[in-house]
Amino acid sequence: MARAGARGLLGGRRPPGLRLALALRLALLLARPPSGRAGAPEAQGPAAPGTTAPEGGDRCRGYYDVMGQWDPPFNCSSGAYSFCCGTCGYRFCCHDGPRRLDQSRCSNYDTPAWVQTGRPPARARDTAAPRDPGRERSHTAVYAVCGVAALLVLAGIGARLGLERAHSPRARRTVTRALTELLKQPGPQEPLPPTLGPPLGGCVQVQMGDGLPRGSPHNSADKKRLNNAPRGSAAPGPPRGPRLQGGGSLTLQPDYAKYATFKAAALKAAEAAPRDFCQRFPALEPSPRQPPARAPRPSPDLPAPLDACPWAPPVYAPPAAPGPYAAWTSSRPARPAPLSHPTARAFQVPRRPGHAARRQFSVKMPETFNPQLPGLYGSAGRGSRYLRTNSKTEVTV
């Protein structure tokens, strides 16, 4: 319009003052800065110091913060804090008007692209692969072959164990035990072996019971009697005083094992010390009847059976004994040569009532009581052989 007026003025004849005013106005219009682009956010400008907050306070719009979280809108209407201040990513209420935030310049009102992750793409292995029938058949064949092989291995192991058990030493041991039981059956009665050696030459006698058989070689007519027992008939009588344990029930067996046992026992007794021999034969219980203070002396024409044994060597001398026996034997001279057994057997003295001849037998030393003379097994060079008991009295029953 101004231009049209200017053209009219230029086209017509106008005064010079009007032309000058129009030129100044055009210069002012050209010197004015542009107001800005359309749709662009307005820049925050400093507010005038006298700027007042809108009625009811300023309102902060909702926005997405730097963490991608949505912050809802809020009003700044708390007293003096009536202005929305801060930045686009962090907003708060303040009382300073010049620090007011121009919210039109911010663009974080929509969901950021980096927040929308979405669903990850499906992997290839998640998709079902097509089934191969040929491959499945091959797997089935492998399983069947392995099962059959395992069954065959188990069957072989079982057969091997059965054969080993059938031929094991336990089965052979059972057969051997049966054969041993058959061989242990008792055989025919055999005579006893010969005596185990020369007599020991001692005067030790051990009385046994009457349970020995009649046909025993140790029960012959020339058996030895007790030293202090009267000579008379051999009729058995009731036992008087205690006997050696196990003597009444001992019977001779022809078994070789028992013979070997007797032989070993005799050899051990012969080699043992006198103290061991005394411990082997326990002492008998004392008789309830007390002996007289002094025994009656026999007649001089009778031999003294207590001085020396008939089968003892010539150099044997009986040991001294305390008591009445020592007093009686000390007054008698030692006999240089004892009478032989048949001669000693010929003498008969009246026996005391209740006494009877007992059969003599030794389990450990059967040779001691055999009717053998001292010269049968000994010689002048070897010397006398007799068993020393290392005691004051002889062991008699």
UniProtKB/Swiss-Prot annotation:
Any Gene Ontology CC annotation: postsynaptic density
Keyword Transferase: no
Regions of this protein lying in the Extracellular compartment: 39-138
Record field: transmembrane: 139-159
Glycosylation sites: N75
Cytoplasmic-facing ranges: 160-397
Family: Belongs to the shisa family.
Annotated protein name in UniProt: Protein shisa-8
Taxonomic source organism: Homo sapiens
